[in-house]
Structure formats: C-alpha cells, structure tokens
Regions:
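Acidic, low-complexity proline/glycine-rich segments
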Residues: 12-32, 160-165
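Single conserved hydrophobic/aromatic residue that forms the stacking wall/gate
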Residues: 1-7, 11
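Alpha-helical rod/repeat scaffolding segments in eukaryotic adaptors/tethers
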Residues: 38-49, 53, 70-97, 110-132, ...
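Charged, amphipathic alpha-helical oligomerization/scaffolding segments
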Residues: 32, 51, 55-62, 66, ...
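Preference for long, well-ordered alpha-helical segments
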Residues: 137, 144-145, 153-166
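Long, contiguous hydrophobic alpha-helical segments, chiefly transmembrane helices and signal peptides
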Residues: 8, 15, 26, 30, ...
Length: 167
C-alpha cells in the first residue's frame, strides 16, 4: 500500500502547505498505521488458526464420530437398516475437516513467512496479497463445517444465535 492516489496527494499537499504536518511526519504516521494494521491482522490470523485447530477441527471430528457410532448402532439392531444419510454426512464432515486442516497449514505458513519480513510496506503488501486470501479460504471451509455440524456440537454461537438472540 502506497499513498499515491490523487486524493492522498491532495491531502498531503494541503497538510504540508498548512503546516499541520511535515513530509517526514506524514510518512511516520503512515508507517505507524501500517505497522498497527500488520500487527492486528497477524494477531487475527494467529487467533483464527488457533480456533480452527483447537476448537473447530476437534468439534467436527467428534461429531463425525458420533454420527458414525449412531449409524453402527442402528445397523447392529437391524443389518437391513440403511444409513445412507449418516454415511454421506460422515464423508462430508471428513472432507471439510481435511479442507480446514489444509487451509490452517497454509495460513500458518503465511504467518511464518510474514514474520520473516522486516519492511512494513512489504509486510502490508504480503498481508493484502497472501494472508487475507488464506484467511478467507479458511473462513469458507469453517462456514461449511458449521452448516454440517449439529448446533449442540459446534463450539461457538451460531450466526443465528448472534443475530436473533439479542436480549
């Protein structure tokens, strides 16, 4: 991110002409804001990774195991009982868990690469070009997992709870 648009040039010229800030002060403020942005997004990415690894993946795996046990229990009672729904659900849950795991690995890799960057502008560009897309990919997979997992097994309030249970 570089403050090079026509509007930012106008603001920069106005602020320096009016002697509100010097050119060096504007650059310093810009770098401080970029650094704050980078730190904030990095904290969000690390939190997202931790939530997926420590809460979402275990919840999905546990729920898939419960569904598989339920299907096995039904078939133990009567071998003629078809458990197509349960089998399909377990396959979907397993696939989405694998997807989440892969995306967490990709996000962790992006976080590690970000931490090697020393220039704040390079870091902000990396966040824009790499880290945010990894976070979005993980979010999409986690949202899919939420739709497949029973509400009682999901470790967080659902969107419905957040939107409609305001008291």
């Amino acid at each position: 991110p570089k403050p090079s648009s026509a509007a930012s040039d106008v603001y920069k010229r106005q602020l320096t002409t009016q002697r509100v800030y010097t050119e060096a002060e504007l650059r310093s403020r810009y770098e401080i804001m970029l650094e704050n942005y980078c730190k904030t997004v990095c904290i969000e990415a690390q939190t997202m990774s931790d939530m997926a690894r420590k809460q979402i993946l275990p919840a999905v795996a546990h729920y898939a195991a419960d569904v598989a046990r339920d299907a096995s229990g039904k078939q133990a009672l009567d071998p003629d009982i078809r458990c197509g729904y349960e089998a399909k659900l377990v396959k979907k849950l397993t696939a989405v868990a694998e997807s989440i795991d892969t995306r967490v690995d990709a996000l962790d890799g992006a976080i590690a690469r970000f931490k090697t960057l020393s220039d704040v502008t390079e870091g902000a560009n990396f966040i824009r070009d790499e880290m945010l897309s990894r976070m979005t990919e993980l979010r999409v997979a986690a949202d899919e997992a939420e739709t497949l997992t029973a509400e009682s097994a999901w470790p967080f309030p659902t969107y419905g709870d957040l939107l409609f249970s305001v008291k």
